[in-house]
Amino acid sequence: MSMLCYTLIIAFLIGIWAAPKSEDNVPLGSPAKSDFSDTNCAQTHEGLKTSRNTDQHHPTPKKSEDQELGSAANIIVDPKLFQKRRFQSPRVLFSTQPPPLSRDEQSVKFLDTEDTLNRNIWANNENHPVHNQGEHSVCDSISVWVTNKTKATDIKGNTVTVMVDVNLNNEVYKQYFFETKCRNPNPVPSGCRGIDSRHWNSYCTTTDTFVKALTMEGNRASWRFIRIDTACVCVISRKTENF
C-alpha cells in the first residue's frame, strides 16, 4: 500500500515538473497569446506603413502594354528560332533600320536575307511602267511598310499579339510588314476604272493573304501565319436588267 502511494506521489511530481511554463517566456502582467498577437499586429501595421510609403515613392507599375501589344525588346529570341523559319515572305522584314518608304529610294539597303526578294518586287514594278496610252490600273492602290503592327488574325481566326521589337543577339530588330491597300474604293464615279457601268456594278476592295510572322504565345515567341493586306482588286457584279 505504501509502495503504491510512493509511486503515485512520484508520478504527480514528474507531471508537474514536465508541464510547460509559458509564463517564463511572457512579460509580467500579459498572457502569452496577447503578446504574440500584439507583436504580429505591430509588425503588420508597420509593414502596411512601409508598403504604403513604398507605394507612394515607387508606384506599382502597371502591366506593360508594350509587352501585350508586341513590343518585346526585353524578350530574348533564340537565333535557332530563325533557322526553323519556313515559308518566308518578302512582305515580312526584320531590320535594325527603317526600310525604304517607297520604291524611289534605291539607296536604302535591306538588312535581311530577303533583300533580293524585296528588290525583285521593285524591279518587277519598274519593268512595267504605267504609260498614258490607255494603260491604267483598274484600282488605285498604295503600298507601305507597317512598323507598328501589334495585333493580327491568325490562320485559325484568333486574334494574336505580334512582336514589334525582337531582341536577337543583343540587338533589337523591328518586324516590318509590307502591306498593300486600296487608295479609294471608287477611283471613278462608276466604280472601278475601265468597267462598263451600263452592265456591271463594280468597286475596289482590299484583299489579304497569310504570311509567317513572329508572335507572342504567353512569354514565348513563336511563328504563326497571320493575315495582312496584300492587294487591291476590283469586284464586279452584273446589273439586273429591268424589262
Swiss-Prot record:
UniProt keyword rRNA processing, yes or no: no
Signal recorded as keyword: yes
Glycosylated residue positions: 148
Coiled-coil regions listed: none
Keyword annotations from UniProtKB, A to Z: Disulfide bond, Glycoprotein, Growth factor, Lipid-binding, Metalloenzyme inhibitor, Metalloprotease inhibitor, Protease inhibitor, Secreted, Signal, Toxin
Example GO molecular function: toxin activity
Signal peptide: 1-18
Compositionally biased spans, kind Basic and acidic residues: 47-66
GO cellular component, one term: synaptic vesicle
Disordered: annotated segments: 47-70
Propeptide: 19-125
Main location group: secreted
Disulfide bond sites: 139-204, 182-232, 192-234
Tissue: Expressed by the venom gland.
PROSITE patterns, A to Z: NGF_1, NGF_2
Assembly, per entry: Homodimer.
Protein name according to UniProt: Venom nerve growth factor
